[in-house]
Structure formats: structure tokens, C-alpha cells
Curated annotation (Swiss-Prot):
Gene3D superfamilies registered for this protein in UniProt: 1.10.287.370
Domain of life according to the entry: Archaea
Species of origin: Saccharolobus solfataricus (strain ATCC 35092 / DSM 1617 / JCM 11322 / P2) (Sulfolobus solfataricus)
The keyword Cell membrane is assigned to this record: no
Major localization listed first in the record, in broad terms: cytoplasm
UniProtKB keywords: Chaperone, Cytoplasm
Keyword Cytoplasm applies: yes
Subcellular location(s) of the protein: Cytoplasm
Name of the protein this chain belongs to: Prefoldin subunit beta
Pfam hit, one: Prefoldin_2
Length: 126
């Protein structure tokens, strides 16, 4: 395929690449959130075995600050709830982006088959 692609195919390929980049960024953010959720769950699990009057320290910036178990658990549960909401939102966005990519891939392959009917091997894969 040494010849230049038609402008409409180039435009669709550019759109495809933008969607792919958007999906990659979304997956990276989703992974970061999932890692933080795992960490919060581990901390909450450890806190659950401590006595209510146990001495707890949390990191605030560059400082270790003494805190009570109840407030730390509340803070962690609030953060966990927020992250779970974000995770569900990202899952929905991921599903939408994957569908858009799939549809656009089919459209591009269809366009390419019209321009290069005997090519057989032309087309893109996600």
C-alpha cells in the first residue's frame, strides 16, 4: 500500500488513534484507582483487628500524625466510596470507548475494502 490513503480514510484513522489514546489514558487511570482501592482495603482489614483505643498514625504530607481509629476508618471508607464510584464510571467509559473503536474499525476496514478491493490483507486491528 505505497499509494497515499484518501483524506476521508486518513481522517478516520486519526480519529481511531485519538480514541485509542483516550482508552489507554483511561485504562491507566483505572489501574491507578484499582491499586489505591486494594491498598485501602488492606489498611481497613488491618484496622479491623486493632482495638478501638489503639494508637494509630497517619501520614499527612511529610508528617506522621497521631489519630484515632474511628476517624481514620471513616476517612478511608469515604475515600473508598469515592474511588469505587470513579471505578464504575471508568468501566462505563471504557465500554463506550471500546464499542466506538470497534465500530470505527469496521468503518475504516469497509472504506479500505472499497478503495483497495483486491488487497485482501488491508485493514486495521485494534
Amino acid at each position: 500500500m505505497a499509494e497515499k490513503l484518501p483524506p476521508e480514510v486518513q481522517a478516520q484513522l486519526a480519529k481511531f488513534q485519538q480514541l485509542k489514546d483516550q482508552l489507554d489514558r483511561l485504562l491507566l487511570e483505572k489501574s491507578t484507582i484499582e491499586n489505591e482501592l486494594r491498598e485501602i482495603n488492606k489498611v481497613l482489614e488491618e484496622l479491623s483487628v486493632l482495638n478501638a483505643d489503639a494508637t494509630i498514625y497517619k501520614i499527612v504530607g511529610n508528617l506522621l500524625v497521631k489519630s484515632d481509629k474511628t476517624s481514620v476508618e471513616k476517612e478511608l471508607n469515604d475515600r473508598k466510596e469515592l474511588l469505587e464510584l470513579r471505578s464504575r464510571t471508568y468501566q462505563k467509559q471504557e465500554s463506550i470507548l471500546r464499542k466506538q473503536l470497534e465500530d470505527l474499525q469496521a468503518k475504516i476496514n469497509d472504506m479500505l475494502s472499497k478503495y483497495y478491493p483486491q488487497g485482501g490483507q488491508t485493514g486495521i486491528k485494534a
